[in-house]
């Protein structure tokens, strides 16, 4: 047996012994009738205590004679004979406990406290004071075991380092990694901030079906499920768009939804099959109004959540304070591939030759618009680091967007990029029912030709448009990618609490 294997075997034995010991301790608690009590009530969290009392001197705390009750997980413990220091962790952070044998009821210190383990959940009451080093602490007069942890915590110095284990056992990741906890707190703040921003602008939050008979609103491969009661195959939604626009037809002129979408596609640092989107629809507006809204939303969130409009992402500083750059798709191609002859982008054969010269495999079903879009994605997208709006998307790749009045080959659409990634997609909505019907037919033809991401024909949606959709603009923003930017995270799994994972065999 190699030394490495021997160490691994020893670790397994040590773990098994610890599990056995902890279960024996729980059995003893059960015999005493004190396992898992539920009558302890705290009155402060650690962050509340630090916010209110960190600025006070010990003399002030002694004069105030403040008694508090806290609860949380025991992360560290230093036993020094008749007294000990404990680090207690709760939702707000950490607070130090000073535990002295003679200040607790008889037997608690030696017979209970010293037998508890790291990871156990405790309740503590006592008076606030500051140590000689100035650390805010609680001098405990009551200490109780609220939950016995049967498994040990990850190594206290290194936390949970294995990346896959962090995703599979997110609870351990949250216990041991401050950075992960902060990421998901920021995510929650972003969601709350978006909702407040939207309500302030007169939008109503709604919910639309997660299971749909016809998946629409995006070009993607759907997940299929079966509804037993209806004996009907259904699809997990790839987007809520068509239902939200039905609501605008119905008279709800400003609606938004924050919820999950599902796309049966690959997993990468940018993609998770289940992801969160915010979609909004605004009557009597066009895509330019949504460019303004998007810019204002990101600037507001950065200022409110981070306290500044400059956001560090990797080795760059993203500036949400200055006006965002705006380029047409063709301008972006020219900027990042200067040798491009713009006239070649108007000719199918010339554009195809450019695409193939940069390694793009051109499918038979692609038209000129799709080829130009693929060229843009290949040569320009990764360079769009600072917030940038790309406009004038071809109609071929924008089946739900309104055609431009001057050039019907393009649409009144934009995509929003930060850090070389698409963050949002918005456009003036197509409200011509006959044009929409024809574009659905074009999508059906593309699907028949082998494009499994092409859209289905949605007859009911066309019928809704025939009743009249006001001039409307719509926008979708990827929440997960937004959170990645605001938390300096470089893989989408770091900002999703429970990302899709292959089961452990």
UniProtKB/Swiss-Prot annotation:
InterPro entries: Aa-tRNA-synt_II (IPR004364), aa-tRNA-synth_II (IPR006195), aa-tRNA-synth_II/BPL/LPL (IPR045864), Lys-tRNA-ligase_II (IPR002313), Lys-tRNA-ligase_II_bac/euk (IPR034762), Lys-tRNA-ligase_II_N (IPR044136), Lys-tRNA-synth_II_C (IPR018149), NA-bd_OB-fold (IPR012340). The keyword ATP-binding applies. Binds 3 Mg(2+) ions per subunit. It comes from the Bacteria. There are two lysyl-tRNA ligases in E.coli: lysS is expressed constitutively, while lysU is heat inducible. Belongs to the class-II aminoacyl-tRNA synthetase family. This is Lysine--tRNA ligase.
